[in-house]
């Protein structure tokens, strides 16, 4: 068992039947140039596959979990979830940067922690897991390492509902939009909680809560935007 397989098994309980796929997912092209004795490929083909797999699995997850959401809501969240900035974040959380096989020059340049490479490696791993074990295994992995971030408000960072709400409301003319903190609970410093309501011309149109005022405001804007968007 190679070190990559050992780490992935310890962290996620995943054991690849085809360990060559796993090595390929973590192999950068310059590494192969410096190790001509290795006959494998770099990660790029698996990255191509993983991109499509992520699109499908995330779309299916959202479709199943949110039966009341309209197509526009599903699309907005899917776009937020499958963009590259989120992939680099989760690749770091999963510790994937430890396993990348880099050429010496890339190692010295700091590529191991480069967002663009980590984004690619995340997709390549997803592609490798799909080829080795199928969509169900990918879903199980994402359910542990990716989907919980929805409830943590992580992906809302990539959807600017405050701007979307402002643009929608101002189509009818000038309006006064205000966000007010209605309640806050700081009893547990590790789990602060804020409740925010958004007002338009002194009328409440949406509320939201979260671990920070910023997240609560975004959720209030999201609720208001979804309620006032024409169906």
From Swiss-Prot:
Main location per the UniProt record: cytoplasm
Binding sites annotated in the UniProt record for Mg(2+): 47, 120, 123
Family membership noted in the UniProt record: Belongs to the ribonuclease III family.
The species this protein was found in: Oenococcus oeni (strain ATCC BAA-331 / PSU-1)
Gene Ontology molecular function: double-stranded RNA binding; metal ion binding; ribonuclease III activity; rRNA binding
BP GO terms, sorted: mRNA processing; regulation of gene expression; rRNA processing; tRNA processing
Alphabetized SMART domains for the sequence: DSRM, RIBOc
Record EC number: 3.1.26.3
Coiled-coil parts of chain: none
CDD domains: DSRM_RNAse_III_family (cd10845), RIBOc (cd00593)
Protein name, entry field: Ribonuclease 3
Cofactor section: Mg(2+)
């Amino acid at each position: 068992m190679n070190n990559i397989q050992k780490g992935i098994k310890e962290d996620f309980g995943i054991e690849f039947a085809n360990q060559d796929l796993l090595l390929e997912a973590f192999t950068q092209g310059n590494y192969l140039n410096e190790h001509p004795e290795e006959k494998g490929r770099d990660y790029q083909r698996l990255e191509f596959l993983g991109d499509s797999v992520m699109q499908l699995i995330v779309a299916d997850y959202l479709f199943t979990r949110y039966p009341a959401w309209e197509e526009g809501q599903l699309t907005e969240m899917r776009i937020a979830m499958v963009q590259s900035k989120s992939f680099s974040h989760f690749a770091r959380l999963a510790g994937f940067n430890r396993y990348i096989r880099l050429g010496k020059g890339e190692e010295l340049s700091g590529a191991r922690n480069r967002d663009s490479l980590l984004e690619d490696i995340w997709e390549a791993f997803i592609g490798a897991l799909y080829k080795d074990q199928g969509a169900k295994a990918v879903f199980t992995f994402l359910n542990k390492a990716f989907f919980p971030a929805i409830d943590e408000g992580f992906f809302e960072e990539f959807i600017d509902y405050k701007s979307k709400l402002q643009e929608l409301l101002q189509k009818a003319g000038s309006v006064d939009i205000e966000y007010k903190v209605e309640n806050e609970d700081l009893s547990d410093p590790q789990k602060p909680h804020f409740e925010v309501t958004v007002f338009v011309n002194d009328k409440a149109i949406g509320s939201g809560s979260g671990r920070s005022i910023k997240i609560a405001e975004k959720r209030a804007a999201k609720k208001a935007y979804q309620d006032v968007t024409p169906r």
